[in-house]
């Protein structure tokens, strides 16, 4: 993990070096506009404004090495968290299929799901299975596929207030 952070630091130094016209370690809005002009941007002012909205964390009108590094680290950590969540659900889906896909066709039919609820002691296994099928079986073919389950989990996570992408 530390090699990744070292690479991010090197990349941030390159970024600052490209934008920082007077080489003082900070980038002003004018330096960013000049950089985008040199790069041939049709909209250098707009590009600079977007850059500053992303990285001028303290709204001082200049971007420092620390601000860029902090934002890149934050985005990297958010990506790692998202990848961990995806892996968690992938593992859960596979374990669910291994346990309840009795005929090993890589999908769950209504009866298999009903038996799943029975095995965990549900008082209303048929109603629970029906509810799940209504929510997840989007093509109404009578089977829950890995893709449908993943899609449902992904949409459910994104609708929660604690998840930010």
Curated annotation (Swiss-Prot):
Domain EF-hand: 7-42, 43-78, 88-123, 124-159
Ligand binding (Ca(2+) 3): 101, 103, 105, 107, 112
Domain of life where this protein originates: Eukaryota
SUPFAM superfamilies: EF-hand (SSF47473)
Record InterPro entries: EF-hand-dom_pair, EF_Hand_1_Ca_BS, EF_hand_dom
Record GO terms (molecular function): calcium ion binding
Key words, A-Z: Calcium, Metal-binding, Repeat
Binding of Ca(2+) 4, residues: 137, 139, 141, 143, 148
Pfam families reported in the protein's UniProt record: EF-hand_7 (PF13499), EF-hand_8 (PF13833)
Binding site for Ca(2+) 1: 20, 22, 24, 26, 31
Binding positions (Ca(2+) 2): 56, 58, 60, 62, 67
UniProt protein name: Calcium-binding protein H
Organism the protein comes from: Dictyostelium discoideum (Social amoeba)
């Amino acid at each position: 993990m530390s090699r990744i952070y070292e690479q991010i630091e090197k990349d941030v130094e390159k970024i600052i070096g490209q934008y920082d016209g007077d080489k003082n370690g900070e980038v002003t809005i004018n330096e960013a506009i000049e950089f985008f002009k040199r790069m041939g941007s049709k909209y250098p002012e707009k590009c600079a404004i977007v850059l500053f909205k992303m990285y001028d964390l303290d709204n001082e009108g200049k971007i420092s090495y620390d601000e860029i590094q902090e934002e890149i680290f934050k985005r990297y950590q958010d990506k790692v968290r998202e990848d961990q969540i995806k892996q968690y659900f992938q593992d859960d889906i596979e374990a669910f299929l291994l346990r309840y896909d009795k005929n090993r066709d890589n999908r769950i039919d209504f009866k298999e799901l009903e038996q799943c609820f029975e095995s965990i002691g549900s008082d209303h296994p048929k109603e629970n299975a029906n509810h799940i099928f209504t929510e997840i079986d989007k093509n109404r073919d009578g089977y829950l596929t890995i893709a449908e389950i993943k899609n449902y989990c992904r949409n459910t996570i994104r609708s929660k207030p604690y998840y930010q992408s």
